[in-house]
Amino acid sequence: MTSRAIIPPGSGVPLAPYSPGMQADNVIYVSGTLPFDKDNNVVHLGDAACQTRHVLEIIKGVLEAAGSGMADVTFNHIFLTDWANYGAINAVYAEYFPGEKPARYCVQVGLVKPGALVEIATIAHKRA
């Protein structure tokens, strides 16, 4: 098995010792992605829809850096801080996955930085 870190151009420095993504053979794992700017500040405070879009754009960038894309996503792990934001998160999520939907789960949690409303981790496959 071969593996490599996926670090898109212009990525900020993570808050902890991890890579934004890892590719192992044809499987791509995207780390839990929060609505942070490159300086690890929470963006779009109080707006779950905008935070979700920001997170999914970061994930899209990691996948594209690995030669994959959103259509190749097979599983998403969604963490939200308040079930009241579930509808807003799903509305944006549906825009990024218009065809067959990836498997997923969604749980309510406390996130690592105040103001972050959503975090998503992703598994995708790279097309041969």
From Swiss-Prot:
Record-level GO BP terms: nitrogen utilization; uracil catabolic process
GO cellular component, one term: cytosol
Catalytic activity reported: (Z)-3-aminoacrylate + H2O + H(+) = 3-oxopropanoate + NH4(+)
GO molecular function: deaminase activity
A Pfam family this chain is assigned to: Ribonuc_L-PSP
EC number(s) on file: 3.5.-.-
SUPFAM superfamilies per record: YjgF-like
Gene3D superfamilies, alphabetized: RutC-like
Keywords from the UniProt entry: Hydrolase
Function, as annotated: Involved in pyrimidine catabolism. Catalyzes the deamination of 3-aminoacrylate to malonic semialdehyde, a reaction that can also occur spontaneously. RutC may facilitate the reaction and modulate the metabolic fitness, rather than catalyzing essential functions.
Family: Belongs to the RutC family.
PANTHER family noted in UniProt: 2-IMINOBUTANOATE/2-IMINOPROPANOATE DEAMINASE RIDA, PROTEIN HMF1-RELATED
NCBIfam families with a match to the protein in the record: RutC
UniProt name for this protein: 3-aminoacrylate deaminase RutC
Organism for this UniProt entry: Azorhizobium caulinodans (strain ATCC 43989 / DSM 5975 / JCM 20966 / LMG 6465 / NBRC 14845 / NCIMB 13405 / ORS 571)
